């Protein structure tokens, strides 16, 4: 363990989770807990070791973390991903609603490389952490977790049950003001076959994806400029909705994990939006170097 470096700056995520700092710190450092909300495998023996790896971790065939600094509120570690050493840090602070968790990381690829699918495993780190922190919040609440992204699979498919009727869930996925609240991004949506769907808004993405299927309350399919598709299917039972999401049409040798992990993190927010309607979003800040202004919509 060495002296603490400056906090990493390429990525900063801040979220409030529903537990005091001591309990959150335990969830961050107990290997059994980490194997529930973060990774397939974990080995933690502080102050000397903080490792996690497996199929739910980018470049996760082996552990590649090295502790830099730990104290009662901070865990900072080097993490080599695709041969590039990054620095990641968890920092905890008290909050009136629990604990403010700040995750920061350095040495990430450019946003343009991520969009072009040329960023490799490092390109998935932002959405990997967003999904992980959402699952940390649900873990601490005793709620069912959202499926993790399997970085070894070329099948991008997930199914969750949401405690709300299909019409309400569907409307929240195609009404921009509702979408903004649970996904945390601005969006323009034209809700009909041939209509556009533009993350960040049509000013940032004039072409957008286009709906090629649209059945209100039941199903929608988006086709992107590269001919990849994302489909949502909703099935109701006893006032609840089984939402199944599938992404297809990509090169199986290069699955678009960054975008898929982003959708999974969104599903976590969608579940909380309907099942915990009196609570505000967990997110307080999302900063990613190079992302255009106006992309994110976080209620401070």
Residue ranges and their predicted role:
Residues 3-5, 10, 74, 78-130, ...:
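Beta-strand/loop substructures that line and gate deep hydrophobic ligand-binding cavities in soluble
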Residues 32-87, 178-229, 236-238, 295-300:
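Glycine-rich portal/gate segments that line the openings of hydrophobic small-molecule binding cavities
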Residues 44, 162-163, 191, 285, ...:
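Hydrophobic beta-strand core residues of beta-sandwich domains
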Residues 1-43, 131, 135-188, 300:
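Hydrophobic ligand-binding cavity/cleft-lining segments
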Residues 146, 281-300:
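Acidic/histidine-enriched, glycine/proline-rich intrinsically disordered or flexible terminal extensions
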Residues 24, 34, 67, 77, ...:
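Hydrophobic pocket/interface hotspot
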Residues 130-141, 267-278:
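Short amphipathic alpha-helical signal-transduction/dimerization elements
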